[in-house]
Every structure is written in C-alpha cells, then in structure tokens.
Amino acid sequence: MEGLIQTRGILSLPAKPIGVRRLLQPSHGLKQRLFTTNLPALSLSSNGHKKFQAFQQIPLGISVSHKERSRGFICKAEAAAAGGGNVFDEGDTAAMAVSPKIFGVEVTTLKKIVPLGLMFFCILFNYTILRDTKDVLVVTAKGSSAEIIPFLKTWVNLPMAIGFMLLYTKLSNVLSKKALFYTVIVPFIVYFGAFGFVMYPLSNLIHPEALADKLLATLGPRFMGPLAIMRIWSFCLFYVMAELWGSVVVSVLFWGFANQITTVDEAKKFYPLFGLGANVALIFSGRTVKYFSNMRKNLGPGVDGWAVSLKAMMSIVVGMGLAICFLYWWVNRYVPLPTRSKKKKVKPQMGTMESLKFLVSSPYIRDLATLVVAYGISINLVEVTWKSKLKAQFPSPNEYSAFMGDFSTCTGIATFTMMLLSQYVFKKYGWGVAAKITPTVLLLTGVAFFSLILFGGPFAPLVAKLGMTPLLAAVYVGALQNIFSKSAKYSLFDPCKEMAYIPLDEDTKVKGKAAIDVVCNPLGKSGGALIQQFMILTFGSLANSTPYLGVILLGIVTAWLAAAKSLEGQFNTLMSEEELEREMERASSVKIPVVSQEDAPSGETTSQLSEKSTPTGI
C-alpha cells in the first residue's frame, strides 16, 4: 500500500480517467454525486491547499489495471467518491451555496436595495415639502420680499453649513457610524416638529417686528433684506434647516450609508434606480403641497391657513423621519456589509484644519468640489431669475405654492423617465459621458431661457397666439429649464458624484463628503447669490445684468466640463487599481499543489507529467 505523499505546484490529473469511471458503481455516478443530500459544496477558501495536499491510496476492494496502479494514487476527491464518502470537509458548504434570486437579483442584494430605495423615497418626500414651503414662508412674510433670499444664502446658510461641517468632522472621529447617523438626523426631526406646532403659532411673539421697523426707518429701504432676516428669524431658520436637509441628510447621511453597504458593481446597476423611488416621492409630495395650497384657499378669512397646513405637513415630515431611522436600523441589523480590499496606506485621525488641508491638496477632491460648486452657481443664476418672474406672475402665496406643487410633480415625472434611461447611459457610455450630460443640458436650456427674456419683444405676437403673455411664457420656459436640469442632476449627476467616492479610502470618503456636500453645495448657491448681488449693485437691476449673467453661466459650465473630464481619468485609474488588488487577493488565497518530482514516472519530469495530464478538451 502506498502512503500519502506531499506535493507542490499544480495538481496533476489522470491522463485517462475513463478507466476509473468504469469501476464506479451506479450509485457513484455524476447524477448521484451532484444531487446527494449530504454532499457539501465546493469552496475555494484560503485553506483550500490543505484539501489537495494529500492524495489517498486506492480503496481496498476495487480492482484496477496495472497501468492505473502504476500511478500509485488517485486524488482524494476521486477516492472519496469511489468509496462513497464525502468529497469535501464540512466547513466548505457556505462559500459556494447558491443564493436565491428574485427577478434575477440575489435576495441579499435586494435586502440592501429595497430599504435604500425606501429611505431615499422618505428623504426626498420631506425635502420637496420643505423646499416648496421655505420660499413661500420667507418671501410672503410681512416686511419681507424675494430680496431676502440672496442674503439668506450668503450670510446665514453658508456660515451654518461650514459650522456643521466642522462639527461633523469632529464627531466622525469620536462616534461610530450608527451613532453619527442618529446624532445628525434626530435634531432635524425634532426641529421641524417644533416649528409646526410651537414656533410658527408663536411667531408674532418671538419676532422683533418693532425693532426691525425702527432700524428700517433709520437705515433706509436698501437694508430691507438684511433686516428681514432679523424680523422673521424663525422663518429664516426654517429656510436654513430645509436647505441643510438637502445637503446633509441626502448627500452625507444617505449617500454615505449607501456607499458603505454597496459594492461598485451594485452601485453601477442600482444607484440610478435609487432615484426611481425618490421621484415617485417627488410626484406624491408635489401633489401633497398642491392639496394643502388649495385647502388654505378654501378655509376662509378667519382661519390661519398656514398654521393648519404647516401642522399637517410637519407631521408628515416627522413621520417620514422616523421611518428613515427605522430603515437605517433594519439594514444595519439584518444586512451584512460587503468586504472591501484594505488600502495599504492607513490614514491616522486628523484634526479639522488637517482634514481641510488634506482635502484641498487632493486633485481628486478638488475636481469633485468643482462639480458641486459649478452646479450650485449655474442653477442659482438661472433659478433666481426665474423666481423673480414667477413672483411677478403669481403674487398670491396660494397661487405661488400651488404652482410649485405642480412644478415638483412635473420634475418627478421627468426625473423618473430619466432614471429609466440613465442605466442604459452608464452601461453603454460609462461614467464620463454620464457626468457631462448635466452641464450640457443646463447650458442649452439656460441659453433658451435667457434668450426669451432678452429678446422677448419679437416673440410677443407668437406668444399671444398661444394665449400667453411674454411674462407667462418666460415662467413656463424657466420651469422647463429647471425641470430638465434637476432631472438630469438627480438621475445622472448625483449617481456619478456618489460613485466617485467609492474607490477612495475610508478617511477621505467620510471627511471628503462632509467638506464637499455640506460646504461646497451651499458655497455654490452662495457664490451665485454673490454674483447676482454684485451685478445688481453694478448695473442697477437684475434685468440689466441678465446678459452678463449669461456670459458667466457659459464660463462656469466650461470649467464644469473640464473638471468632469479630469475626474473621469482619475476615477478610471482608481477603479483599475482596486480591481487589480481584488484579483491579487483572490489569486493569493488559493494554492493547489502538484505531484512531487521524485514520484513522477521514470524519464518524466514534473512539468512533463503535468503537461501530459492536463485536459485539453474542456
């Protein structure tokens, strides 16, 4: 009886396995082997070389030819099958167990994708209600006007966003990811509930209207915007919190969590589809805003319609916020995190200033920041001009809010359609083309909107035949511009931006998202507001500065496209490196041995034996 032998290299298989197959009993056939109830599955685990290190001698009771016996051994798997035993160890079952699928998608993947889609639905439902409500609150309040918005974005929203980023960076170094998520989102839920049920009903008592009137009489009407911030400070705080909900909860909390639990392949397939549920929420939330706008109109003169509607809408916001927390808890409880390749360079914890210096020194993060800032400035240059026309066309708060509800619904429908097409764009053309579509759409539609404003006179007869005034036509064209730009942002720009974070190391990913999404997003909006303020002071009015705003828009979109092209090359390089690391890890985890040279038949080297026994007809 030959003993077990130790081998190294590549496994040498029998040159003619047919003879062995004849010796097997019917119960040892392929069908019985594959469908045996107690047969564990094959595993290519890291200890796989131990399974193949030893070769078992031929079982007693089996007659073999002299040629077969001259080999002196058969592999352990063959011997076990011939003897009716188990081929593999008991610990190998889990690795190759086939995961069940629904509609072609693994259940483990659906356990991540479905809750993430529901979370995005709830977050965007809240954001639409908050976004449509904040403008009506601050613009239609007593002693305020649309002039307050640029001052709010520049002098209130941006400082609070920077302060939040600094606090978030500190908390990210001391709190776990779960604790950080709850620590950030719970204050939003509490505030919006308190605003609807406490702060707004007491607004007449907590707003310093008498002091604001005295200061306005002393300083003059040109300071009406800054003084309005003090006059209606609780409404302005609501405005800022609504803005932060979009940048913090959507960009930092949700997308950071999604990047944490999804792989790159899952992201390419499902990130564009996350927005499907979100834009269904956009459609329904738009209808919700429209419903409450009509309800305010029908309540009668003696009832404060805003108080009634705010209580209802803030109750919905709080309920959706609690649902977000539950979904986050459920995913962390029942969904395993994907394993990622470890980065060779482990970055230590950094302070706030060190984090900012690191982010500024990274070309990758700078290009990402350029994308976010460029979008914020570009959309702001067009949107504020459009809102000034919208205010002139719909001066009533009820009409203004109702139009915004219709606008949100149309945006949801357009974005839903774009989401269906976006997966094809990513699959067919890749990340780079998808990242460049949004600036191209914004540029083309922006040119159309500004052209109608600047050259509206010649189009007046044609517009009159359509039953519209030039002002109403500008409102509708501006609405279309915003709808197409926002749908391109939600379906292509946001997924592209979030995919760009995935190949980064954990430290850059967390602090980079905080700096870009919380600071750069408001910086883009505030930058657009500063440009408009400068133009108004220089040329006397927003209308007089419109041609120059168009030129600025062209320059910013050009820089946006250049940054997208630069980021495309860096992203592809990082993805190639990460894929190479995964391949190397997989290759190093499996070691399959071969027959040692001393046991090879006389006159044959190990390499010759391996070559001779390698199957060629597979």
From Swiss-Prot:
Membrane topology field: Multi-pass membrane protein
InterPro entries xrefs: ADP_ATP_car_bac_type
Region of interest (Disordered), residue spans: 586-618
Chief location category: plastid
Any one GO molecular function term: ATP binding
Keyword vocabulary terms for this entry: Acetylation, ATP-binding, Chloroplast, Membrane, Nucleotide-binding, Plastid, Transit peptide, Transmembrane, Transmembrane helix, Transport
Transit peptide, start-end: 1-76
A GO CC term attached to the entry: cytoplasm
Protein name: ADP,ATP carrier protein 2, chloroplastic
Lineage: Eukaryota, Viridiplantae, Streptophyta, Embryophyta, Tracheophyta
Record gene name: AATP2
